[in-house]
């Protein structure tokens, strides 16, 4: 493992590798531990960047604890490489000055930087398991109702699913329990407030989290994102229904995603990888 680390750091002009090691070359593919269908392509990117230094500085500003970043390579599916690209821009891997690894991802509504590992060694051991928005079909629950929910491709399909399963209890992948609602339980003004707060053209209620401590409503917007709302706040829970089914409310407890746009940052509650309670500074 130490030889691999030396090669990795040599790629980033940190150290000179020992003579017995073979440094990774630009364009070389490094298979990921998870997910198995993707690899790291060293020093290759599929988006236009005019100034690499300024772009890395811009991405670092997304973090709650900014640090200098260095571009490592792109995360590509083997299918993407086989067909020589598609309309989706591959995610990019960055190395922080602290040794932490981050993943840049381009979403429909914003880009983001996600904390993926504390070190190069951890990244090589776990891959992208800390990226909650990355899901694989094998993680889907076996219940037909949740598989049908994950398969909804647009907001109208979701509304039909809700009508089919209204009133039922659903156990998500993190074992959180959701009660599916009907739209009649909500005032038009409440739904419109949600729509304005998340900046979407259309939102639909999903239900509420079964909890003895607070009333937490859940709704879906026309980008198929899932949000949680109480009397005071709205925050994003999942970037897709697939993520919501497999991860449930995980982002409320462990969230390493940092969005780039101001509107999404207001709707996101990240967990500092260094254990700093930034909420204390925000309230000061």
Curated annotation (Swiss-Prot):
| Record has Repressor as a keyword | no
Q: Which GO terms describe its cellular component?
A: host cell cytoplasm; viral tegument
User: What GO terms in the biological process aspect are recorded for it?
Assistant: symbiont-mediated suppression of host innate immune response; symbiont-mediated suppression of host JAK-STAT cascade via inhibition of STAT1 activity; symbiont-mediated suppression of host type I interferon-mediated signaling pathway
Q: Which Pfam families match?
A: US22
Cell compartments where the protein resides: Virion tegument; Host cytoplasm
Q: Which domain of life is it from?
A: Viruses
Keyword terms: Host cytoplasm, Host-virus interaction, Inhibition of host innate immune response by virus, Inhibition of host interferon signaling pathway by virus, Inhibition of host STAT1 by virus, Interferon antiviral system evasion, Viral immunoevasion, Virion, Virion tegument
User: What's the main place this protein lives?
Assistant: virion
Q: Which family does it belong to?
A: Belongs to the herpesviridae US22 family.
What biological function has been recorded for the protein in this entry? Plays a role in the inhibition of host innate immune response by disrupting the interaction between NMI and STAT1. In turn, NMI-mediated transcription of interferon-gamma stimulated genes is inhibited.
Assembly information from the UniProt record = Interacts with host NMI; this interaction inhibits NMI interaction with STAT1.
Q: What is this protein called?
A: Tegument protein UL23
Coding gene? UL23
